[in-house]
Design a protein with these regions (language model features):
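Adenylate-forming
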Residues: 1-33, 59-70, 84-92, 115, ...
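Conserved C-terminal "lid"/linker of ANL adenylate-forming enzymes
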Residues: 42-48, 57-59, 77-152
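Hydrophobic face of alpha-helices
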Residues: 25, 29, 73-77, 109
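Short acidic amphipathic segments
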Residues: 32-41
């Protein structure tokens, strides 16, 4: 199955335990497909020290001319809550410039997960279409610190 807009593959093999339930990121992708202002997305889990479960981070690549503001975040949260459940709602919905993908258009979730969890990404090889975009995800490894600083 392919994401209607970018034609990237919808299937997501990564399954994690988020908020006490086990689900795959593809469940979120199906909901996000209904947002015309979103060009593509990727989701992964982030486990902080001391957390029993991972929290969900949802990254959105917005269509040109669209911005991820609080109104869009609210609509995304409400759609996920309605179509899936309240436990599927991501902890954070964040805007990125690009989504890492393979040459055939499949999202590379494990790389994003490695980076946002402060780990060195697993071997990328030559199959990644846009390796330069991975650097942007490094700033989300210390997301709680960044949020605290912004609130000051």
């Amino acid at each position: 199955m392919r994401y209607a807009i970018t034609k990237s593959l919808l299937s997501a093999n990564a399954k994690s335990t988020f908020t006490g339930i086990r689900f795959g990121a593809a469940e979120l992708y199906g909901v996000i497909e209904g947002f015309p202002e979103v060009l593509d997305c990727i989701a992964c889990g982030q486990r902080r020290p001391g957390d029993a479960d991972e929290r969900v981070l949802l990254f959105l690549k917005m269509r040109n001319g669209s911005n991820l503001d609080e109104a869009v975040r609210s609509r995304v949260r409400n759609a996920i809550r309605k179509q899936l459940s309240a436990r599927h709602v991501p902890s954070h919905i964040l805007e990125v410039a690009d989504i890492p993908s393979t040459l055939n258009g499949k999202r590379i979730e494990h790389v994003v997960s490695d980076v946002v969890n402060g780990r060195k990404p697993r071997a990328l090889g030559s199959s990644i279409a846009n390796p330069e975009c991975i650097k942007e995800y490094e700033k989300f490894a210390d997301l709680d610190k960044r949020i605290a600083v912004n609130k000051l």
